[in-house]
Amino acid sequence: MRVLCTNDDGVNAPGLKVIEEIADQLSDDVWIVAPELDQSGVSHSLSLNDPLRLREIGPRLFAVRGTPTDCVIMGSRHVLGDKQPNLVLSGVNKGRNVAEDVVYSGTIAGALEGTILGLPSFALSQEFGGPQNRDKPMWDVARAFGADVIRKVMSVGVPTDTVININFPACAPEEVKGVVVTRQGKRNQGFLRIDGHYDGRGNPYYWIGFEKFPVPDIPGEGTDLAALEGNYVSVTPLRLDRTDMRFSEQLANLFNTP
C-alpha cells in the first residue's frame, strides 16, 4: 500500500513527523508532500493565480509553496505520477478539528481533496487542552491510537464520497476511555474576537483572535465535542456532498413544476 501524507501546519511541523510515524505502521511506501509554510485556516483553497514551487527536501519528502489541497494534487498527479497512492493521511494537526472547524480546516481539506480524487482519506488532529498547552500537545495519544483506528476503518472500506475525521483527546494514552463514532458538533461562537491595532503611520489593522477563557461549550450528546471532553477518540465520517436533502424536498414543492 502506498500512502500520501500532507498537513496544513507546514513541512517542519512536529505533527507531520507524527503522521509519518503512523503511516509507517501501515506501509513501507510512505510519501510526504506538505506546504512549505503554515497554511492553517486556508480551508479547501486552490492556488490558481500563483505558480506552485516544489522542493525535494529528502527521500519521499517534498515541500510545496501552496495549500494542502495543492499538495495532495501535486503529490498525486505529479510527484507519484502513475504510482498512485492507495491512502491519503492529513495531519496530525496541532489542535482539534471539530464542529465548525471542519469548514475552515486545511487539514480536513487535504483529506477531502484525496476523497475528491477517489482515494480513501483521513484527517487526524490532536487536541492540546487549552491555550497554555498550545506549544506542547500530547502527541502520544495520536501515536498510540492512529494506526489502529485507520486499519479498522479501512477493513470495512471508506465510501467514495466520505472523508474520515479523527480527533484525539488531550490526555495520556492510558487515560483514553475508548474510540467512538460521532457526529459533527456545534460550538459557542463567543470565542471569536477582533483585535485592533495601529501601525507606525497611524493606520489601523486587525487580527482575528480568540478569547483565552471563552464561554464554555455545552456539547450535544454523540458529538465530536462531547467525545473529546470525555477523553474518547472521536471518529466522524464527513460527506463531500453537502446537500440538505430534507430542505431540498421542501423547496421542491415551491419551485419544481409538475
Curated annotation (Swiss-Prot):
Binds 1 divalent metal cation per subunit. Gene3D superfamilies: Survival protein SurE-like phosphatase/nucleotidase. It catalyses: a ribonucleoside 5'-phosphate + H2O = a ribonucleoside + phosphate. Its EC number is 3.1.3.5. One of its GO terms (molecular function) is exopolyphosphatase activity. It comes from the Bacteria. Pfam families: SurE. It is found in: Cytoplasm. A divalent metal cation binds at D8, D9, S40, N93. Keywords: Cytoplasm, Hydrolase, Metal-binding, Nucleotide-binding. Its cofactor is a divalent metal cation. InterPro entries: SurE, SurE-like_Pase/nucleotidase, SurE-like_sf. GO terms for cellular component: cytoplasm. It is an enzyme of class 3 (hydrolase). Nucleotidase that shows phosphatase activity on nucleoside 5'-monophosphates. NCBIfam families: PRK00346.1-4 (NF001490), surE (TIGR00087). Belongs to the SurE nucleotidase family. This is 5'-nucleotidase SurE.
